[in-house]
C-alpha cells in the first residue's frame, strides 16, 4: 500500500491538474503512506513490555493519530479545491478549517503526559484516553462533509464529465470510512490489521 501511495503521489506531479491540486494529491499520498508505516509499527510494538517496545508504541500512536487527521484534512482541501469551494477562498477560512486538526496533533503528542487521547500501560498495551473520540470526530467530519458536498454537486451539474468527477470525490473515501469505523468499534484492531492477513 505504501509503495502504491508513494507512486501515485509522484505520478500526480506530472498530471494535468493545477499545481495546487497536484501538490495536495502528492501530500495526501505521502501522508497516507507515512500513516500506514507508523500504524504498522504500532501493530508490531503493541503488547511489547520492553522499554523499546513501549517507546515505539507511544511514538507510533502519537504520529499515526496526527497523520490520520492531517490526511483527512488534506483530502478535504483537495476535494473542495476540485469542487471550486468558497470555503478555501481566504487564508482566514483555511486557518479556521485547520484548527481542529491542530488540536488533534497537540492532544496526541501531549497524551504522553496527560493520557487524554491514549496511553500505553505498564504491559506495553495501547489504551484509549477520555478524549479519544475527538480524533475520529474531527477526521470524519472533514471527509463526510466534502463527500456530501460532492454528491450534491454531482446532482446539480449537467456536464457528464463533472458528474463523474464529483461522484468519484463523493465515494472515494467510503472504504476508508468503513475501515475506520471498524477500527473504532474494535479498539485493538489497527488499520494494518484490516488490510493484511493475520493468523
Regions found by a protein language model. Name each.
Residues 44-51, 83-86, 112-120, 154-158, ...:
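Transmembrane helix-loop junctions in multipass membrane proteins, especially transporters and channels
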Residues 52-62, 122-131, 190-191:
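Non-cytosolic membrane-interface motifs at loop->transmembrane helix junctions
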Residues 192-198:
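Conserved small/polar residues in nucleotide/adenosyl-binding loops
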Residues 6-10, 74-78, 139-159:
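Alpha-helical transmembrane segments in multipass membrane proteins, preferentially the mid-helix core
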Residues 1-16, 20-53, 57-77, 97-114, ...:
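Hydrophobic alpha-helical transmembrane segments of multi-pass membrane proteins
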Residues 12-25, 80-93, 154-164:
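Membrane-interface helix-boundary motifs at transmembrane edges
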Residues 1, 107-148:
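Extracellular-loop-to-transmembrane junctions of the mid-late helices
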Residues 128-132, 152-172:
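Membrane-helix boundary/juxtamembrane motif in polytopic membrane proteins
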Amino acid at each position: 500500500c505504501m509503495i502504491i501511495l508513494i507512486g501515485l503521489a509522484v505520478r500526480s506531479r506530472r498530471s494535468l491538474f493545477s499545481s495546487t491540486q497536484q501538490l495536495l494529491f502528492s501530500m495526501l499520498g505521502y501522508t497516507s503512506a507515512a500513516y500506514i508505516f507508523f500504524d504498522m509499527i504500532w501493530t508490531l510494538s503493541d503488547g511489547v513490555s520492553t522499554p523499546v517496545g513501549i517507546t515505539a508504541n507511544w511514538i507510533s500512536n502519537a504520529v499515526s493519530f496526527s497523520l490520520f487527521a492531517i490526511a483527512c484534512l488534506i483530502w478535504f482541501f483537495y476535494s473542495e479545491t476540485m469542487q471550486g469551494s468558497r470555503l478555501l477562498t481566504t487564508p482566514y477560512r483555511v486557518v479556521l478549517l485547520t484548527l481542529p486538526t491542530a488540536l488533534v496533533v497537540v492532544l496526541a503528542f501531549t497524551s504522553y503526559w496527560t493520557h487524554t487521547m491514549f496511553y500505553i500501560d505498564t504491559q506495553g498495551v495501547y489504551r484509549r484516553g477520555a478524549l479519544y473520540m475527538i480524533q475520529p470526530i474531527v477526521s470524519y467530519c472533514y471527509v463526510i462533509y466534502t463527500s456530501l458536498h460532492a454528491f450534491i454537486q454531482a446532482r446539480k451539474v449537467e456536464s457528464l464529465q463533472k458528474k463523474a468527477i464529483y461522484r468519484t470525490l463523493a465515494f472515494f473515501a467510503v472504504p476508508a470510512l468503513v475501515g475506520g469505523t471498524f477500527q473504532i468499534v474494535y479498539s485493538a484492531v489497527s488499520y494494518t490489521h484490516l488490510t493484511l492477513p493475520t493468523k
